[in-house]
């Protein structure tokens, strides 16, 4: 096979709507261009610097066909490895290389991986409101669109604090009360089941807001409402507590969006302490490790529910779809509808149909970027106040 030489690499940061989105573009001597998602929205310029200053000079002139070798070289070339900056940068290139390979083969990625395991993947979206009445409206809107899996949140992550008992001069931050959050969330589950019965599956994201003993209590209490899964009940640093939760509750557990490397998920999967792995594909380094993770999880009966928040590009979301269509143990896919400007920048962005995401039949990833449109929306710094989460006494907590 004749080599496909990498001739240039670009990294573009654009903010068409609320989030800074990072896209890697790989050019080749055959005129075939690949696109990848490298979004780390809290530190987008760090990822751009990694691509522009380090990965581009490392890769230009090399054969784009050798994805496995290039992935390992990118990952170890700096010696210090793993973490959101280097992993997202590597992932953007990795996705672009797979995109090129699919285009050269004239095959969509899921065919290149080995074909489909299903006709479509069920999607879930987010219903959130500060009030139950508002939440009901959101649930019914999504249900009417065909969703039968809905993530429900009363208030923002950590709930909607009522009469917070804070200090006299609170440090700036996003405050919440863990006890109020648990009580309000359990009341939310009860109200949803009483109103809707089993018409749809309820998902919920704790978003790491509890201490371990509280997580045990919450998992036991919420089990009676039969959630599809409870997401990120603990921060990764406390995941050894999952064994205790597992021993006391049958509630399905999902985690993984902050994971960087196999050491973080290996024991959880082997010991079957989670039901769903929710890794963010660019956060773990791209398609190359995601395929391996999928097969590894299947061997232990753990299913896949890739992280797909609004702060990633439609290119990254399309990659998730290809993985889901191919990998046998894919369970469900998070999805949030794209705002207008994002659809202008990524005109091939894929949307669900009646609650399902269907295979993308275009060669490669099948979603690109309109570079001219993207340049109309330059990067804008955001302080991300919501990650400055604090308890009533002012202690900062995992967001």
Curated annotation (Swiss-Prot):
A Gene Ontology BP annotation from the UniProt entry: amino acid catabolic process
Signal sequence extent: none
Residues reported in the UniProt entry to bind Mg(2+): 205, 231, 257
Annotated disulfide bonds: none
A Pfam cross-reference name: MR_MLE_N
One function term, GO molecular function aspect: magnesium ion binding
Domain of life, per lineage: Bacteria
Residues binding D-arabinonate, per UniProt: 207, 257, 278, 307, 334
Entry keyword set: Magnesium, Metal-binding
Biological role: Has no detectable activity with D-mannonate and with a panel of 70 other acid sugars (in vitro), in spite of the conservation of the residues that are expected to be important for catalytic activity and cofactor binding. May have evolved a divergent function.
Family: Belongs to the mandelate racemase/muconate lactonizing enzyme family. GalD subfamily.
Record protein name field: D-galactonate dehydratase family member Pecwa_4254
Organism: Pectobacterium parmentieri (strain WPP163) (Pectobacterium wasabiae (strain WPP163))
């Amino acid at each position: 096979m004749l080599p496909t030489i990498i001739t240039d690499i670009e990294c573009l940061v654009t903010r068409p709507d609320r989030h800074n989105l990072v896209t890697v573009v790989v050019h080749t001597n055959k005129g075939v261009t690949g696109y990848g998602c490298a979004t780390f929205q809290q530190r987008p310029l760090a990822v751009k610097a990694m691509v522009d200053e380090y990965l581009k000079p490392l890769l230009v002139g090399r054969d784009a066909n050798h994805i496995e070798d290039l992935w390992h070289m990118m990952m170890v070339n700096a010696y210090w490895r793993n973490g959101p900056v280097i992993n997202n940068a590597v992932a953007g290139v990795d996705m672009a290389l797979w995109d090129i390979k699919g285009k050269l083969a004239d095959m969509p990625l899921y065919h290149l991986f080995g074909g489909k395991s299903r006709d479509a993947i069920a999607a879930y979206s987010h219903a959130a409101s500060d009030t139950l009445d508002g939440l009901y409206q959101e649930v019914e809107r999504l249900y009417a669109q065909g969703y039968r899996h809905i993530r429900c949140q009363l208030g923002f992550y950590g709930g909607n604090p009522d009469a917070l008992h804070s200090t006299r001069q609170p440090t700036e931050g996003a405050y919440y009360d863990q006890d109020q959050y648990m009580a309000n969330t359990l009341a939310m589950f009860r109200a949803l089941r009483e109103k809707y019965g089993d018409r749809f599956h309820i998902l919920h994201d704790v978003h790491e807001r509890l201490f371990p003993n509280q997580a045990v209590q919450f998992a036991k209490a919420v089990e009676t409402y039969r959630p599809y899964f409870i997401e990120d009940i603990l921060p990764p640093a406390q995941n050894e507590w999952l064994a205790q939760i597992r021993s006391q509750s049958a509630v399905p557990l999902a985690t993984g969006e902050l994971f960087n490397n196999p050491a973080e998920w290996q024991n959880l999967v082997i010991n079957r302490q989670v039901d769903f792995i929710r890794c963010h594909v660019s956060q773990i380094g791209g398609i190359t490790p995601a395929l391996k993770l999928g097969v590894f999880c299947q061997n232990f009966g753990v299913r896949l529910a890739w992280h797909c928040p609004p702060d990633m590009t439609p290119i990254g979301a399309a990659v998730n779809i290809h993985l889901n269509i191919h990998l046998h143990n894919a369970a469900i896919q998070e999805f949030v509808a794209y705002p207008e400007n994002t659809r202008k920048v990524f005109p091939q962005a894929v949307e669900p149909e009646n609650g399902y995401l269907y295979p993308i039949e275009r060669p490669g990833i099948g979603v690109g970027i309109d570079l001219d449109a993207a340049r109309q929306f330059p990067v804008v710094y955001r302080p991300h106040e919501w990650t400055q989460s604090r308890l009533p006494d002012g202690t900062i907590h995992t967001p």
